Amino acid sequence: MASSPSYIPYLCVAAAAFITTFLTVPLVKRLAIKLDAVDYPSKRRINTKPIPRLGGTAVFLGLVVACIVQIMGTWHLGWPPVLVPHPRLHISYPMLALSFTVIYATGAIDDIFQLKPKQKLAGQVLAALIACIGGLRIGVIVNPFAPGEIMLGWLAYPITVVYLVAFTNIINLIDGLDGLATGICGIASFTMFSMAVLSGRIDAAALSIALFGACLAFLHYNFNPASIFLGDSGSLLLGFALGSISLLNVSRTAALTSLIIPLIVAGVPIIDTFSAIVRRKRAHISIGQADKGHIHHRLIQEGYNQKQAVLLIYAWCIMLSAGAAAINQVEVPMRVLIFTVLAIGSAAFAKHLHLFEPVLRHHYNKRTHEDELVTPDDPAFKQEEQAAEERKEERHHRR
């Protein structure tokens, strides 16, 4: 493999992650039920029966075993070393492993004990800081306006922390339908694997293909009808892993294009998060207040069932990932053209789904005797939400 690319090590790493995750999910389900780490039906959740969460535990174990297989292959089978010096970074891989452990532990504790938002954010920041201290950071970028590079200095730390925390949360926020976050991360990780192989980053390639194997195995249990959810232990881990992989690739060249490509790959959850912020600001409510205006909610409201909605979002992700891969291989004029097409297409789909418009409800005004559309900041909205929930429970009891 030293002289020409061999995919046998990557296949072994992916297989190790797949098999481990596949075999441990049933054990994790029993553990989650025992610990009462269960998602019960509610007005914001799609599931109609209790589903165990904590699925990230199986994904985490899959990644751990995959890393062990890679290390053993390097020692005993002559595989090329993954933990090689980075051309721009001095990465401490034990510190990177510790950051993954911290982000998983944060999500797992939240799955079991329900952390406060600030506590969960603190865990994410800690994990990102550990990764930064371990050398995973954007220290320099190519100046897009003049020849040369821009050294970020101490700004590399806050910029990288914000980047990793943001990447972590965009996956967490879109985890709303069976198999949605898992499938999106599977598509993104495979795309990043192909880019890592082309750029010669064996560490990023091994980690991304391990993540792909774990996602593929978990999807067997998580696709509709799901028997287990990722939970925050999984969604936080997947988002953090994708962010870390993107930095391993991005930091190699520090070019503006290489900074944009991972954002295109993760375009769907980024659009979903950005539209949620705009939508809630327009409705005059806190950006942290949950609503039913996410992509998957809008598709369900359009009349699609869970499977159809998830498959449509998969198709959107594949389109963006294919575009990102193409941008990575062509010259500047074609890059601009591809990016423009992707941006216009995504904007048109977002507009069709009314992603940036406040969530509305019909409300019968007893004083005026008229049907009104109310936004979440109107007290009548909560009345209609409660009435809808009561009707849902009544239908459930009748069954």
Q: Predicted segment positions?
A:
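Alpha-helical transmembrane segments of integral membrane proteins
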Residues: Q301-M319, I327-N328
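"…together with the soluble PPM/PP2C metallo-phosphatase catalytic core" -> "…together
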Residues: A2-T273
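Long, low-complexity, intrinsically disordered cytosolic termini of multi-pass membrane proteins
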Residues: Q306, V359-R399
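Extracellular/periplasmic helix-loop-helix junctions in multi-pass membrane proteins
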Residues: A322-T340
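Hydrophobic transmembrane alpha-helical segments of multi-pass transport and channel proteins
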Residues: A266-F274, A322, A348, H352
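Cytosolic, membrane-interface loops and tails of multi-pass inner-membrane proteins
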Residues: L27-P52, S275-K307
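N-terminal hydrophobic signal/anchor transmembrane helix of membrane proteins
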Residues: L248-A255, V341-P358
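Membrane-interface capping segments at transmembrane-helix boundaries
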Residues: L27-R30, F349-N365
